[in-house]
């Protein structure tokens, strides 16, 4: 076959390169006539092979559509859509779609073979396998593709396993939530703390035990109920702060400071509802003067700056700690720390007394100015 085609390639190349010498060749028969004039003898079978040889590869991704005035170099037709092959020659679309060789008929430049690309074949067989109803398509390498029904069955199994896993994960969470709700309902049904304390005086103490008692914070009950007023909530917070300090061995934990800020916000909300601002001052004095030591001055100032008696702006009922003036209509006031035998205490000072104290340099230490 190669021996037959090799002289034909030379002849065809010469014919295509010298078309102008033989006039306008606009058909395949005209090309055969030109070959007969050049004493090129071919059989009918070789004629079919020669016609197929004049077709090129399907290389649409390597070419682009153009329109040239010259005829196709294979069929010699004009007024058709042409393609430019990688070597720079032009052929028509019809001749371009039926190739048998991977070379250019003009210059014999080799092209990469696209028909042997396994990607297109694999994609076609896989799509064909999915459209069937339970049949398999086997490739030459022995790889089998599953049908669409089996893929859907696998998806159903995966969905069922995910649902069962979620149910297993949610069971302990639901049980914990139900247990907490039962505990909250039981705590709401407990008697008032004052009555419980009075009954505890008449009840003999329990026998000693080696088991460490569980520390129950008062704030746990305060979060689950709303029957406590501002004063009672303040006392409970004081007890909780003292418990935290005793357990942690002092102040210095940022998480502890953050929790105190959250407690102060709760006291502010309770003070607004009950219109009892003295509870705020009582809690601040207890927190700053007794609980927080001197080495926590920066943290103490931070808390005072964030929460320094905002309730006075709305409905104040306090008086100045020096002159006794009612602080209800005062727009500006200050918080000062006064040293005493037990350490120090906080007082609220009106704007006039604050200015006098600043001039006289009294022992009052300014902590915060509220404008």
UniProtKB/Swiss-Prot annotation:
According to UniProt, the name of this protein is Putative RING finger protein ORF117
- Which PROSITE patterns is this protein grouped with? ZF_RING_1, ZF_RING_2
First and last residues of each zinc finger (RING-type): 72-108
Which species is this record about?
Answer: Ostreid herpesvirus 1 (isolate France) (OsHV-1)
Segments of this protein annotated with the region Disordered: 178-218
Has UniProt tagged this entry with the keyword ATP-binding? Answer: no
ATP-binding recorded as keyword? no
InterPro entries assigned: Znf_RING, Znf_RING/FYVE/PHD, Znf_RING_CS
GO function term, MF aspect, one: zinc ion binding
Q: In which domain of life is the source organism classified?
A: Viruses
Q: Report keywords, A-Z.
A: Metal-binding, Zinc, Zinc-finger
Q: Where is the composition biased (Acidic residues)?
A: 178-192
| Alphabetical list of Gene3D superfamilies matching this protein | Zinc/RING finger domain, C3HC4 (zinc finger)
């Amino acid at each position: 076959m190669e021996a037959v085609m090799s002289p034909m390639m030379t002849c065809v190349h010469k014919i295509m390169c010298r078309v102008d010498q033989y006039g306008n060749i606009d058909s395949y028969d005209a090309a055969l006539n030109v070959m007969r004039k050049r004493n090129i003898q071919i059989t009918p079978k070789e004629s079919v092979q020669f016609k197929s040889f004049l077709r090129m590869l399907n290389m649409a991704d390597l070419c682009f559509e153009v329109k040239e005035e010259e005829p196709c170099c294979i069929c010699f037709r004009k007024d058709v859509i042409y393609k430019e092959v990688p070597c720079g020659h032009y052929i028509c679309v019809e001749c371009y779609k039926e190739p048998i060789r991977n070379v250019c008929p003009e210059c014999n430049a080799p092209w990469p073979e696209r028909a042997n690309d396994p990607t297109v074949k694999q994609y076609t067989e896989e799509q064909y396998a999915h459209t069937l109803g339970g049949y398999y398509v086997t490739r030459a390498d022995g790889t089998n593709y599953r049908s669409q029904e089996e893929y859907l069955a696998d998806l159903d199994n995966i969905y069922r396993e995910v649902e069962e896993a979620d149910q297993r994960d949610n069971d302990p969470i639901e049980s914990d939530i139900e247990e907490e709700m039962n505990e909250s309902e039981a705590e709401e049904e407990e008697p008032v703390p004052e009555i419980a304390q009075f009954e505890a005086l008449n009840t003999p103490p329990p026998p000693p035990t080696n088991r460490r008692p569980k520390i129950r914070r008062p704030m746990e009950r305060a979060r689950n109920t709303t029957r406590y007023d501002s004063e009672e909530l303040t006392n409970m917070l004081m007890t909780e702060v003292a418990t935290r300090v005793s357990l942690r061995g002092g102040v210095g934990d940022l998480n502890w400071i953050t929790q105190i800020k959250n407690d102060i916000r709760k006291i502010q909300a309770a003070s607004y509802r009950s219109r009892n601002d003295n509870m705020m001052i009582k809690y601040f004095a207890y927190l700053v003067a007794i609980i927080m030591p001197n080495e926590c001055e920066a943290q103490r100032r931070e808390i005072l700056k964030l929460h320094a008696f905002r309730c006075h702006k709305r409905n104040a009922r306090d008086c100045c700690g020096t002159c006794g003036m009612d602080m209800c209509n005062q727009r500006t006031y200050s918080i000062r720390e006064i040293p005493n035998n037990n350490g120090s205490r906080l007082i609220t000072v009106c704007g006039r007394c604050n200015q006098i104290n600043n001039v006289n340099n009294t022992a009052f230490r300014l902590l915060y100015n509220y404008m």
